[in-house]
């Protein structure tokens, strides 16, 4: 069993499943639902479904949403400490999901912006660290998270980064993000993100460019599976066939499947398949978390 520290964010997802094309400036028929979310929190919750343990470092506001988010983490068995230490409201993400299951997100980081180094637990017993890119892209939490990464490196814990969407990354200079990638033992991206950071429209060239910065590069290819390269060794696996309902949280669930298996086995194929299997479960339902039942 592996124990993973997940650093970054927890939020409320407000999901609008569109029943028609958006009628700008007018009403659009949709189905609205709310779900707990946040990249780091999603990864932590999915990790608990792999017979591994997770501890979340994030913040919520002292508000009804915050109480509900903490209660939900407890139901999944995600460890945490002092999440409710911010004067800001809890984070919220509004998500539009089209008829193909693709999502467009409108994030408000909320209380997660107030992360501090003191939020870290003792590192004893941890096997690895996952860092949400949102926590680094937000200038208000960036310094604290970089200090957390420094401490994890001193403790010789493997660190994995998902830098988040290309749209979010464009708020920070690419050169700065590449410096963060160079601090990592591994980076997990989708096709678009890899081409953006890797500086090439050829995905394999982009992957090779990124591996000059970090020993492990994992690229999620959606319906075409996933690929990875580690110290020059390449592997690719197909996606697990499923009925796609909502892709929200697909990358988070993939990370939760991949990282513990990689730490256990060091086998690229096994780890990619573990990530793909968990992602298939995620996209078959609405929301970014596994069902509690």
Segments and roles (model prediction):
Residues 1-5, 151-154, 202-293:
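Conserved phosphate-binding/catalytic region of the ribokinase-like
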Residues 12, 16, 62, 165, ...:
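Short, glycine/acidic-enriched loop or turn micro-motifs at the edges of active sites
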Residues 27, 31-38, 64, 89, ...:
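Residues at secondary-structure transition points
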Residues 43-44, 69, 148, 278:
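Aromatic/hydrophobic pocket-lining residues that form π-stacking "cages" and hydrophobic walls in ligand
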Residues 50, 88-91, 222:
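Short, basic and Ser/Thr-rich N-terminal targeting/leader segments
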């Amino acid at each position: 069993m592996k124990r993973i520290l997940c650093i970054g964010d927890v939020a409320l997802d407000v999901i609008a499943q569109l029943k028609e094309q958006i009628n700008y400036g007018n009403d659009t028929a949709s189905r609205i639902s709310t779900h707990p979310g946040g990249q780091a929190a999603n990864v932590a919750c999915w990790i608990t479904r792999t017979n591994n343990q997770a501890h979340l470092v994030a913040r919520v506001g002292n508000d009804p949403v915050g109480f509900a988010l903490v209660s939900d983490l407890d139901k999944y068995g995600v460890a945490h400490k002092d999440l409710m230490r911010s004067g800001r409201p809890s984070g919220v993400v509004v998500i539009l999901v089209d008829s193909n299951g693709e999502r467009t997100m409108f994030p408000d980081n909320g209380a997660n912006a107030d992360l501090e180094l003191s939020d870290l637990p003792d590192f004893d017993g941890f096997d690895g660290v996952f860092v949400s890119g949102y926590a680094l892209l937000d200038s208000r939490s960036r310094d604290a998270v970089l200090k957390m990464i420094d401490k994890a490196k001193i403790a010789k814990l493997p660190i994995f980064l998902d830098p988040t969407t290309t749209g979010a990354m464009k708020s920070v200079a690419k050169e700065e993000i590449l410096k963060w990638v160079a601090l990592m033992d591994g980076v997990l991206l989708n096709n678009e993100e890899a081409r953006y950071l890797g500086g090439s429209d050829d995905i394999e060239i982009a992957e090779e460019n990124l591996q000059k910065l970090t020993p492990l590069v994992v690229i999620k290819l959606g319906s075409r599976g996933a690929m990875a390269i580690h110290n020059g060794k390449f592997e690719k696996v197909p996606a697990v066939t499923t009925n796609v309902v909502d892709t929200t949280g697909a990358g988070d669930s993939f990370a939760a499947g991949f990282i513990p298996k990689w730490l256990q086995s060091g086998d690229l194929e096994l780890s990619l398949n573990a990530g793909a299997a968990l992602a298939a479960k995620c996209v078959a339902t609405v929301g970014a978390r596994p069902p509690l039942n």
